[in-house]
Amino acid sequence: MASSNPPPQPAIGDQLVPGAPGPSSEAEDDPGEAFEFDDSDDEEDTSAALGVPSLAPERDTDPPLIHLDSIPVTDPDPAAAPPGTGVPAWVSNGDAADAAFSGARHSSWKRKSSRRIDRFTFPALEEDVIYDDVPCESPDAHQPGAERNLLYEDAHRAGAPRQAEDLGWSSSEFESYSEDSGEEAKPEVEPAKHRVSFQPKMTQLMKAAKSGTKDGLEKTRMAVMRKVSFLHRKDVLGDSEEEDMGLLEVSVSDIKPPAPELGPMPEGLSPQQVVRRHILGSIVQSEGSYVESLKRILQDYRNPLMEMEPKALSARKCQVVFFRVKEILHCHSMFQIALSSRVAEWDSTEKIGDLFVASFSKSMVLDVYSDYVNNFTGAMSIIKKACLTKPAFLEFLKRRQVCSSDRVTLYGLMVKPIQRFPQFILLLQDMLKNTPRGHPDRLSLQLALTELETLAEKLNEQKRLADQVAEIQQLTKSVSDRSSLNKLLTSGQRQLLLCETLTETVYGDRGQLIKSKERRVFLLNDMLVCANINFKGQLEISSLVPLGPKYVVKWNTALPQVQVVEVGQDGGTYDKDNVLIQHSGAKKASASGQAQNKVYLGPPRLFQELQDLQKDLAVVEQITLLISTLHGTYQNLNMTVAQDWCLALQRLMRVKEEEIHSANKCRLRLLLPGKPDKSGRPTSFMVVFITPNPLSKISWVNRLHLAKIGLREENQPGWLCPDEDKKSKAPFWCPILACCIPAFSSRALSLQLGALVHSPVNCPLLGFSAVSTSLPQGYLWVGGGQEGAGGQVEIFSLNRPSPRTVKSFPLAAPVLCMEYIPELEEEAESRDESPTAADPSATVHPTICLGLQDGSILLYGSVDTGTQCLASCRSPGLQPVLCLRHSPFYLLAGLQDGTLAAYPRTSGGVLWDLESPPVCLTVGPGPVRTLLSLEDAVWASCGPRVTVLEATTLQPQQSFEAHQDEAVSVTHMVKAGSGVWMAFSSGTSIRLFHTETLEHLQEINIATRTTFLLPGQKHLCVTSLLICQGLLWVGTDQGVIVLLPVPRLEGIPKITGKGMVSLNGHCGPVAFLAVAISILAPDILRSDQEEAEGPRAEEEKPDGQAHQPMPDSHVGRELTRKKGILLQYRLRSTAHLPGPLLSMREPAPADGAALEHSEEDGSIYEMADDPDVWVRSRPCARDAHRKEICSVAIISGGQGYRNFGSALGSSGRLAPCGETDSTLLIWQVPLML
């Protein structure tokens, strides 16, 4: 019944009536958009025809529901609908249960979003509408007022009815997955009229996209009218951007719509157009196959199971198993109809991106796919149990598989929705690569790529969480209810970080392998659990659906007590006297005197062969000494040949060491606490696991290390979401605060931080596990100084888990900026081809450039810490150097007086030409505060304007205003994908601009995410900005650091998820945010430099001194064969040596082709023709597919250290540095494998 009072602001999940007055536009942050068809005829017959249940109180002001058949439609296919019917014969409401709904006239109902509750329900009676993405064709959209509606903003006309608006691609599309977009425009957001001034092209884009949608989807709209019996849009919720729309189930006719089909290829197409047509054909073919798979799930499995008597599977279980399959099919059926229309007119429009945006940017798609993904594990569990307990069901699945043409199982069909969006992403990436700049489809493709990536990321995260819950539940079932482990697992405070099946090995007293067995190892956030795997089930069932194992817990231990120990590790890290090594039948203590405190684990044959080579080398050296006493001169028996034997044996020893290292790459040795011995002394026992590949071992070692760091007080918790539940844990990928160190070793001077860069340098001395646990290898260069005094540079080594200072040197003036300049790819290749250079000073190496306050520009080599200044110069007019950037052509310096100085490369391309006068360009009247180097352009900021320069000629192309306030300056610019995020000298907002159109796309208010940490703090300013690994780091002048997720791919890097705030920050402004990245390969035990220099150094040894290996520091693997070896290192023939040939045979013909050294059984000497194989040994099968490992750390610099977690209840604690000391905080990110 109607109420005289205005309705209150609706809460999330409340039911809304379509006609109820919504909140005013001033109070809304994201009102979204309501697509409606204008209709005024026959509305009163709608609810009676549909039989809609009334789930909300009736109101007199509610408009009746709209029946699409009431709209006059000219059907191109009159035979599709029988005459005399108000509803087409091929439209129905699905299940028979719908007949129970009748008599409702004015109604609307809502279902709460499945993401708002921990557990979703399976509605038995409520049927849901599927598709609401049909654009409205309201004539109001073409009025002049519509031009004021911006792409990512909500600037509504005062008093305009929301139902009549049509924004084309509106905020509801682009913010559909945002979880806190309502906070972006609340405080300190300028009026829309100011924003329009720097968006001249975006409104044109919106109109063009709208026009394209109207022209390209007209047939789609008509088809939707014919095929959808109900389309309902709700009013927008007040402060929520989530569209909790109802879903009414709609059955689609069996009559197939026309399949999308490309016409014949026109003549005169460019190569890119031809490729785009082929990619479109792949999209059409892939989508058709996917829709057919969804139909097979319903027609071949769900419908027969529902109709089967007696039932092999109950109706309730069928609903659970096939939950949301029909809705997904309806979504893609609509998309296929729209795709068919777009394909038919492809040669005239060549646009496809806007279709993906319109079809998959709605929260409805995320809802149905989220429900499906969350339900997938439970559905497979029901199928598995039914196969084990109901033979009729198992026989049904086998029969259906045999009858299918491709023999795909039900599991193979049901896993396709999980794989669908990654397939879309790959196709759109290919399409974007072949779409030139300026093409009308390019921006829409970038937006579509962003939407699909965001959707896929959310689904992946939900799938990961669902699998994590399933694994913990499966593990909990194997534990007794009364055990302490059960209480820990069921407390809800445990987070599964890593879970994998490893092979546990047991060795004998002499190191021989006795037995091995697979174990399931669980790494939780505070404990490590090992369980036996017990598979029970028929083999024929596992071919139809994956069978989950049952676990029997073998042992569990607290994480801080677990230690990773490498074979041959020094005894200083643990007490070998109390270590128990698992042997067959019993555990025996390893005496400290046995085997020189070294334990040989694994196949001992490699160690034995290495020892044999050592003994043989000693014998050959004695022979060499005897040969030196010969009085005669012989061609094949002299000191040259003898030294060649020695060098060859040394090389073979290195090959054997490589094999030992390779075996150790997959061997994970864990030292665990054991029961005390009889005297009460604590003991430990060693467990050895074999990982599936080297990457797996690296992942385990890294996650174990970071999980221990995560248990420290400062990381409990380390990150908070402003509105998250206190019981929830931060995502497993969150950076972990690893250490807090003083920025300068000398505290006598009050030095202020200026800049920081990371110089990646691989350390060949680090072991396999040390690389997995250490920070990104290389050196940190930290620069700063004191106002009016000198500057200082501090160099830290990161080749250990905690940084340490290795060098510090003073400068004449404070350091304001730094830039790391890597070597060009062609330079690196030329250096690899010619490793020796005539002039060592001309050797190409990465460099580090420093800009000082007195106008000096200094260039240093970054290979070592010798800190030799390679070149230096003074800026024009001795202006302070505020920023430095490099491009392939120039070293760019932004100066205080608004000048951009460009230094070209030298003629040899090794260094920058700092001696000649630079190319100078005046950017503006104010200082050039930041520079950004793109592929084909350079962006320079001066005040609120940004100037775009051509990369090679530095000619200004265009400029634009990034901020409407002339007193505000652009201070930071960072690029991600096809966008650039900017921060300003004042204000709490950051803005996103497109790299190609220069249009303003999004604005985020940082203050809304920090108010709960700094209550009452109104004046907040962004002081630093960084994008790395899909995360946007924002530093503020209050010492707070905010983390926002952004897309990683080539799309638009708009922020769509919730931000997180670090509880660890600084006492003052965050001076800078920098990233340290090093790329490692699985074969990281020896660097290329060490391998390349090794043979040269040995060849230069005059005495042929034997290399002293350390065979007892590694574990090897068995050789598959043992053959004779030709001891030949450098000599291919001794014919050139003086003296006769010592042989009882006749000399061979002197044709120059025969070798005096014949191979005894030397198949191993295939390596003789390839020197690199000598060094690198033969490739290991497990290393055939090598991947890069990316180690990442984030460094922030500022005054002091503050833990905001303790500050919430008190004034905060400051440790370990003082408030005024310059401090570095280093966050470590899990290895990107």
Swiss-Prot record:
Residue ranges, compositional bias (Basic and acidic residues): 183-193, 1089-1104
Residue positions, PTM Phosphoserine: S40, S240
What the entry lists under CDD domains is as follows: RhoGEF (cd00160)
Q: Which residues carry this modification: Phosphotyrosine?
A: Y131, Y152
Where do Low complexity bias regions lie? Answer: 72-89
Keyword entries, A-Z: Cytoplasm, Guanine-nucleotide releasing factor, Phosphoprotein
GO CC term, one of those recorded: cytosol
What is the predominant subcellular site recorded for this chain? cytoplasm
Q: Where does it localize?
A: Cytoplasm
What InterPro entries does this protein's entry cite?
A: ARHGEF10/ARHGEF17, DBL_dom_sf, DH_dom, PH-like_dom_sf, WD40/YVTN_repeat-like_dom_sf, WD40_repeat_dom_sf
Q: Which residues cross the membrane?
A: none
Q: Where is the composition biased (Acidic residues)?
A: 26-46
Q: Which residue ranges does the record annotate as region Disordered?
A: 1-93, 159-193, 1089-1117, 1140-1161
Q: Name one GO biological process term.
A: SREBP signaling pathway
The record places domain DH at 275-462
Keyword presence, Cytoplasm = yes
Q: Which GO terms describe its molecular function?
A: guanyl-nucleotide exchange factor activity
Please note every region of biased composition (Pro residues). 1-10
Annotated PANTHER family:
RHO GUANINE NUCLEOTIDE EXCHANGE FACTOR, RHO GUANINE NUCLEOTIDE EXCHANGE FACTOR 10-LIKE PROTEIN
Chain's role: Acts as a guanine nucleotide exchange factor (GEF) for RHOA, RHOB and RHOC.
**Subunit info?**
Interacts with RHOA, RHOB and RHOC.
Q: What is this protein called?
A: Rho guanine nucleotide exchange factor 10-like protein
